């Protein structure tokens, strides 16, 4: 028990969590997933309740009647069996109940995929902030080294005091930027941990420019999209509801058998009885016709929603695919600019150390590099978001 307690405490915090681990935890711990799983269990019991209307019903009764001393007390025992023989409404209701369970299973799949998308978004948001911290650390190291160089030159009387003050100011800015980046990273970790229902102290991963093979995106969307599957199932259930309403036109037939044993009877054999019942509603004021019409209208409404949703998702998919291509081209351009900015900073630093360039030139080159590297990270982050949207829509 002590070992188990220590093990559970150790699980409360997650260090260096990967994307795969985060996706696994999301599917296990997300509130929406757990609620959907409970709803499936509730619908399983609902099916049992509906199934009871087509199964035999057995009832028994025991009675004792005390009379005066001059009369004989009466003891009675009865048992009855009722078996539906033909009840189309009950069968159609059972189909609807089973369809509802299947619908909830599809909803669970849809919720799971949406949770995966949310995990990806929050994970890559945290990863972006972590990369910002790395950039801030590199920037801080650069200005620390620059300050040491300027202090040496100032002590030797080579550089004026304004250069020293400027170097200290840039170092202070770098420290402040690092603290801000660390705080944003911790906020991103807390947001991810809130979704995963756990404490996360760090994540592990890197931005990758993953390529996915795209065929007929409209076909893949219709075949694989979980949200469309949910809406398609709603149409099926609406059609089943139409059949259920139509089944109410038909009569019901049931058999009833009973046995009664009573001490008041002269012959116990008289206690058996059997009945065959036919129930039919002759006229209900066209209520059933109205119910069928309403059910048909619901089918039309669900069909319209399905077509609108399909068009909406297809438009979103095309936009996301277009974004992937555009961002990929932008990343290639930024990477080239990044190499150029690194070389420009190297040359400016060397020129400054040899007294050819000013510290302002170095400052401008460093700021340009920081801006380009941040732009590259943002582009990689946007690429992952668009990729997550595409995966959500067609996988």
Spans of features found by a protein language model:
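Sec-dependent N-terminal signal peptides
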Residues: 3-12
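Bacterial Sec-pathway N-terminal export signals of envelope proteins
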Residues: 15-59, 98, 158-161, 196-239, ...
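Periplasmic alpha-helical coiled-coil/stalk elements that build and connect Gram-negative outer-membrane
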Residues: 17, 112-223, 320-323, 327, ...
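Small/polar (Gly/Ser/Thr/Ala-rich) solvent-exposed segments
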Residues: 34, 57-74, 84-110, 229, ...
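Amphipathic alpha-helical coiled-coil segments
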Residues: 35-50, 111-138, 145-147, 151-152, ...
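Outer-membrane beta-barrel domain signature
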Residues: 71-72, 146, 176-179, 183, ...
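Membrane-embedded beta-strand positions in outer-membrane beta-barrel channels/transporters
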Residues: 78-80, 123, 254, 275-277, ...
């Amino acid at each position: 028990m002590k070992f188990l307690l220590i093990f559970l405490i150790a699980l409360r915090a997650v260090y260096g969590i990967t994307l795969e681990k985060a996706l696994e935890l999301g599917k296990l711990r997300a509130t929406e997933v757990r609620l959907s799983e409970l709803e499936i269990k509730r619908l399983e019991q609902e099916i049992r309740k509906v199934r009871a209307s087509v199964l035999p019903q057995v009832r028994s009764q025991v009675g004792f009647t005390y009379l005066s001393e001059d009369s004989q007390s009466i003891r009675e025992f009865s048992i009855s069996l009722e078996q539906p023989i033909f009840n189309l409404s009950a069968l159609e209701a059972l189909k609807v109940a089973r369809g509802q369970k299947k619908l909830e299973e599809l909803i669970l799949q849809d919720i799971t995929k949406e949770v995966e998308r949310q995990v990806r978004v929050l994970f890559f948001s945290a990863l972006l902030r972590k990369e910002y911290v790395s950039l801030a650390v590199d920037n801080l190291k650069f200005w620390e080294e620059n300050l040491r160089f300027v202090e040496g030159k100032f002590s030797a009387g080579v550089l004026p005091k304004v250069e020293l003050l400027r170097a200290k100011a840039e170092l202070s800015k770098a420290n402040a930027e690092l603290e801000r980046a660390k705080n944003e990273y911790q906020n991103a970790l807390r947001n991810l941990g809130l979704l995963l229902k756990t404490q996360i102290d760090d994540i592990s991963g890197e931005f990758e420019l993953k390529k996915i093979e795209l065929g007929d995106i409209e076909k893949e969307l219709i075949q694989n999209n979980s949200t469309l599957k949910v809406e398609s199932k709603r149409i099926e259930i609406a059609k089943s509801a139409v059949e259920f309403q139509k089944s109410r036109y038909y009569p019901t037939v049931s058999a009833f058998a009973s046995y009664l044993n009573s001490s008041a009877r002269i012959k116990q054999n008289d206690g058996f009885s059997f009945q065959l019942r036919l129930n039919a509603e002759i006229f209900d004021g066209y209520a059933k016709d109205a119910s069928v019409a309403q059910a048909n209208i619901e089918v039309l409404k669900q069909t319209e929603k399905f077509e609108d949703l399909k068009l909406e998702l297809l438009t979103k998919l095309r936009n996301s695919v277009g974004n992937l291509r555009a961002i990929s081209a932008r990343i290639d351009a930024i990477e080239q600019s990044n190499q150029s900015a690194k070389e420009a900073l190297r040359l400016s630093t060397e020129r400054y150390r040899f007294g050819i360039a000013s510290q302002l030139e170095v400052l401008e080159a460093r700021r340009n590099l920081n801006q380009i590297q941040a732009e590259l990270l943002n582009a990689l982050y946007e690429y992952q978001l668009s990729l997550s949207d595409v995966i959500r829509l067609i996988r």
